[in-house]
Amino acid sequence: MKYAVKMPKVLQAVYPKRLWSINTADKVVYLTFDDGPIPEVTPWVMDTLANFNAKATFFCIGDNVRKHPDIFEQLIARGHRVSNHTMHHVKGWKTPLVAYLREVDSCQNLMELEAGQEIHKLFRPPYGQLRSKQAKALQKKGFQVVMWDVLSADFDTALTPEACTKHVIDNAQAGSIVVFHDSKKAWPRLKLALPEVLKYFSEKGFAFKCIP
């Protein structure tokens, strides 16, 4: 499995309209969680974040919102940001433009229906896969495409929790957007890595905020 834990600057420069990190001098890290909400993991994530007075951005799969609206509503009630991760976690490189936009719109409409309010238009493409035409069409619809600059790689079953923790501690800095997953696949690594990351950066004087 090939991926970059620290997103190369050259790749960020190629796609400057995508959000890779937040330009700030403040000691803030932006934690993000992909693929929820699910009852097995997401409530624990919320409780763990609360122990450190931390807020985060959750990129939700629409079908999981449909299945677990109560957990989705808890995310909003507890001050986290909920954002779009398509309806069914589709791959951008294999999905035609019209079908891809339908996936995004369906997720956005469902979230707004469940929330009873407008949802800020942040979008993260599943697997990080997004064609230029898809990105341009989403931007025309008012979406900010959010990528990341640090990957915990908690999805990688070959890794130990300690390795995932080290990925974040060694690479995150002020303004970093960090990826975790509130999924059953990531859980064996997430349950140990997330508290350690929160503890480490809290002791360094960092705060954890939602992506604005």
Task: Set out the residue ranges of the language-model regions.
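C-terminal domain-boundary segment and adjacent tail
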Residues: 14-24, 51-53, 66, 188-212
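CE4/NodB-like, metal-dependent polysaccharide N-deacetylase domain
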Residues: 46-55, 81, 97-129, 136-140, ...
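Short histidine/acidic/glycine/proline-rich micro-motifs that form metal-
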Residues: 60-65, 88-91, 128-129, 151-155, ...
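Structural detector of well-ordered beta-strand residues that form the stable sheet scaffold
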Residues: 30, 57-59, 83, 124, ...
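Conserved strand-to-helix beginnings and helix N-cap segments that scaffold or border functional pockets
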Residues: 42-43, 69, 97, 135, ...
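Active-site beta->alpha N-cap acidic-glycine motif
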Residues: 2-93, 99, 106, 110
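Charged helix-capping and loop-helix junction motifs
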Residues: 73, 100-104, 159-166, 191-195
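His/Asp/Glu-enriched short active-site or ligand-binding loop at hydrolase and phosphoryl-transfer sites
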Residues: 129, 134-171, 205-212
